[in-house]
Amino acid sequence: MEEFIKILTDQIRCVKARQGIAQEISNHILDQAEAYEQAGLEHDKALERAVQEMGDPVEIGISMDRIHRPQINWKMLLVTFILSIAGLVCMTPMFGVSYVISRQLIFTFVGFGVIVAVCLMDYSALGRIGIAAGIVLTIVFTIGKRYYFQTINGRTPAMSILVYLYVPVFAGILYQLRKKGLSAVVLAVGIVGLTFVLAMHFSSSLMVAGNIFFCMIILLVAAIVKGMFGNNKKYMIRLIGIVVTSLTAFFGWLLWTNKDSYRVQRLIAFFNRIKYQDAEGYYYRVIQEALHNSKWIGTGNSTYFENYYFPGLTEGELLPLAVIYWFGFIAGVILLALLAGFILCAINIVRRQKNQLGALVSLACFLVLVVNCVEGILISVGLFPVTTAAIPFLTRGGSTALVYAVLIGLLLSVHRREKILTQEAI
């Protein structure tokens, strides 16, 4: 049997695929041999017959080599390229041709380089260095916030997107904690809480920290459902439910006892737009005015919108609204369709994963992408409180381009190796 498997695996060019394939073939042969033993054959003869029935190892190996090799998701790469170009075009009316060419175009090219580099890397390293990667990220963020990144009005804009890198790192941490039972779940919950505090500290944004908390809780539940921490799934999920409910109630109480804070006032203004339209609710008046005066094709006719100071617009966080106003509703629909196609490509990658780490890493990247897409679009049409948002391809800046390039690269890396890495090979 060993010689048969060696000849077979020698035909497979991808070295990383050999171990998993050898294990699969070995299990299949042993199962068949066991069936022959139960039928009355001796062990050696049963094993010999099972090997003979497998056929020519060279032909089988060549056939498996066609399947178990790295693959590129060209569809997702194409959608990424189209959205990158569309994003540059959409930014031009807001920031000008000189800015787009001198800065954002460079960020886009660098981003594509990062996508390719991460795609070619072995994402399974996250399953071995997740905890160490989290510590390194925290050190880098601490140094960056203190000495490098620009702080504006108490906030560090770059950190509002960079902290999302904690999410795929958490996927690697969960994989490291697998098979360790309830204690690992409790530790994972503690890591989620610590990450929330760190994200809040670095980004100075409750919404960003909340988004990260949400993504990490979903990842933890997914890991439990997959049986990574044992079979007592219902108890573990109830434990997480209690923690999430308690924290939600606690933060709700904090907001209620701090009604005069700007966060609470902006939230109240979202539900009482007419009453607060000259104060915190002026954002929603601008959004309503822009949408009301937009056309199906071409630029809208609201000088009020163009001249009004709107931080979300000047920073590019609400670019979908600007696209609708400057290019028309049809352009907005096309842009939305492209984003939907991109998200569907990501969903397809997540859905196809069979090994635990690939499933968690792809899910982590997908969650960050979809949360920011949905949140940014809803904000742009006035269906969500105005807050910090970084929509993929539609928010300017080097940090945004870098983070989304890493996430897209990880998705492509998972897809590239989905027919190579088995659970045992990781």
Q: Where do the language-model regions lie?
A:
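Hydrophobic, glycine- and aromatic-enriched re-entrant/interface helices and adjoining loop segments
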Residues: 234-332
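Loop-to-helix entry and N-terminal half of a specific, functionally important transmembrane alpha helix
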Residues: 349-387
